[in-house]
UniProtKB/Swiss-Prot annotation:
Source organism of the structure: Chaetomium globosum (strain ATCC 6205 / CBS 148.51 / DSM 1962 / NBRC 6347 / NRRL 1970)
Its job: Transcription factor that regulates the expression of the gene cluster that mediates the biosynthesis of the tetramic acid Sch210972, a potential anti-HIV fungal natural product that contains a decalin core.
Chain spans, region Disordered: 232-283
A cellular component annotation (GO) from this entry: nucleus
Polar residues compositional bias, start-end: 261-276
Main location: nucleus
Lineage, opening ranks: Eukaryota, Fungi, Dikarya, Ascomycota, Pezizomycotina
Compositional bias of kind Low complexity: 238-249
Localization in the cell: Nucleus
Name of the featured protein: Transcription factor cghF
Keywords, ordered alphabetically: DNA-binding, Metal-binding, Nucleus, Transcription, Transcription regulation, Zinc
An annotated Gene Ontology molecular function: DNA binding
Length: 528
């Protein structure tokens, strides 16, 4: 449990915040600084411009005529639809382009006859397309953010007026797009943007998406394939929720599909019947597992990664010039997922209680994974900037990816503190210590850049400032940054929803330019 101004929050043992709390040297210092901070407002937001989930808070007073009147001109919507299907890569997995185009034409012929939910689906397509536009294509970034909020309102209004809780065609598809939009906007690992998933999953189950359509002869092969594609995002999202929200998983792959009865006899089971507990996710398992089992799982993980199709295996960018940015981002996602699982498997054996030689492999595995995560964070920052190989794919960054970077940073800090104090003389790979120290130093400007719009980034920057290994190595940019900003500009006047690029970030770029150039020169990018 972690104490905050709003009370206590629960974090699972594999969450980055739990790892940070294990660093004894930083706990007292950060607690003192937490007391000195001003109380957080009731809504808990840093930037008041960042809304909560509109589906949970938005009252609906508009009529269908008012909603349709707010629809952009068809020429504009045509461009947004084209961008959605051509740029996302993920969107066509839940919407069939030819089928959507037919319904799209029918909408423009008679908008009043179109169901509310389909209108909401169209607004969700427009909303995501606006989020993924390139800076400079349209008006200022701030006006883009305002339009996104307006489209969020329309999506919610259409869902409510269409009585989405009763299910129906395109309800789940609209919810998938809506949740994706919310998660792309959020900067922190707050629970709020994930709450709509708690609505989406039961809706998907009520529509039978948790069952394979092959067993239902009345569902055509085409409809069955589309149902499988629509069912994938809710399943993946619910498995990702614990990573981003600090909570144990509440949805397991064993739950949706019922198993066969244990007995074919008509006698019912009673309260006295004893049966084995269902299997549990290892990350949420409260019981100790034998160390040989952990090593076996680690080997299985390596085997699975090796068995991936070549197109999805991570290769250095120097060997990937001809690979589309979307594929590169998928490769990066998969590699980060593997590194996160490595930490989940071995994080427990970083503790001083496991200082014996047999556990050295786990300590080294965590250190290597944390170092590689930090290198990926730096790589992603460089390549999503204008001119980078991943600039067109920068929209694919989200709070889920940031939580992986936070986990890597936390484990790296813990490993540095552990090998310096709790395990003196053990694991003293000085080259590894220097590499991790340098990467933590290099990522500090990135956390500081996002600290104006992200509580998690602000905490990460604060923890790095307090890390003994980095004392005297971090540039003093706070005073220079405040000198370049006008009074009262703690919240940037405009910020890129993907990078947080407003006055705060531009001033930080000016202050840290030399440091960035030095990092580009010294970093071993060939390894990444």
């Amino acid at each position: 449990m972690r104490e905050h101004s709003h009370g206590a929050n629960y974090v699972s043992s594999v969450h980055w915040a739990a790892v940070l709390d294990s660093i004894s040297e930083l706990i007292d210092q950060c607690q003192e600084k937490e007391k000195e901070k001003k109380p957080v407002p009731e809504d808990g937001s840093i930037a008041p411009q960042i809304p909560g989930p509109r589906l949970l808070y938005e009252p609906v007073k508009e009529t269908k005529a008012e909603i349709l009147a707010s629809m952009p001109a068809r020429t504009v919507v045509d461009r947004m639809v084209a961008r959605y299907f051509n740029a996302l890569g993920i969107a066509p997995a839940i919407l069939h382009s030819a089928q959507f185009l037919r319904e799209y034409e029918s909408f423009w012929k008679d908008p009043d006859a179109t169901p509310f939910v389909w209108i909401g689906l169209l607004f969700s397509v427009i909303c995501l397309a606006v989020q993924f536009q390139q800076p400079g294509e349209e008006a200022a970034e701030w006006s883009s953010l305002m339009r996104i909020r307006q489209f969020h309102d329309r999506i919610v209004q259409c869902l409510v007026l269409g009585q989405y809780t009763r299910g129906g065609p395109y309800v789940v598809e609209t919810m998938v797009n809506y949740c994706a939009s919310e998660l792309c906007i959020t900067k922190d690992t707050d629970v709020g943007p994930w709450l709509p998933l708690g609505i989406m999953v039961p809706l998907a189950v009520s529509r039978g998406y948790h069952r394979d359509p092959a067993g239902f002869p009345n569902i055509s092969p085409f409809a069955g394939e589309m149902r499988r594609r629509v069912a994938t995002p809710p399943n993946h999202a619910t498995s990702s929720t614990p990573t981003s929200t600090r909570t144990p998983p509440t949805y397991h792959p064993h739950g949706p599909r019922p198993k066969s009865p244990l007995s074919s006899t008509p006698s019912p089971r009673t309260e006295s019947t004893k049966s084995a507990a269902p299997s549990r996710d290892l990350a949420a398992d409260a019981h100790d597992r034998p160390y040989p089992e952990i090593l076996a799982l680690d080997k299985d993980l390596q085997t699975i990664e090796t068995s991936l199709p070549p197109i999805f295996r991570w290769q250095p960018l120097s060997q990937s010039f001809m690979v589309p940015g979307q594929v590169l981002m998928f490769r990066l996602w998969l590699r980060l997922a593997v590194l996160r699982l490595v930490i989940w498997l071995h994080r427990k054996y970083l503790a001083p209680a496991y200082s014996a030689a047999p556990y050295a492999y786990s300590r080294a595995a965590c250190a290597r994974a944390a170092l590689e995560i930090a290198e990926f964070q730096l790589l992603l920052h460089e390549e999503t900037r204008p001119g980078g190989q991943l600039h067109q794919m920068r929209w694919m960054q989200s709070s889920l990816m940031q939580s992986t970077f936070l986990l890597g940073m936390s484990v790296a800090c813990y490993w540095m503190q552990l090998t310096r104090t709790a395990l003196p003389g053990a694991d003293q790979d000085m080259e590894m210590r220097e590499r991790i120290r340098d990467r933590l130093r290099d990522t500090y400007p990135l956390w500081l850049r996002c600290s104006a719009v992200s509580r998690d980034a602000r905490e990460a920057a604060e923890r790095l400032r307090q890390l003994p290994d980095l004392q005297g190595l971090l540039p003093d940019v706070e005073g220079q940054l405040s000198a370049q900003e006008s009074p009262g500009s703690g919240v940037p006047a405009c910020w890129d929803i993907f990078h947080g690029t407003g006055r705060h970030a531009r001033a930080l770029d000016a202050v840290l330019g030399d440091m960035d150039r030095s990092r580009k020169t010294n970093a071993d990018w060939a390894r990444v």
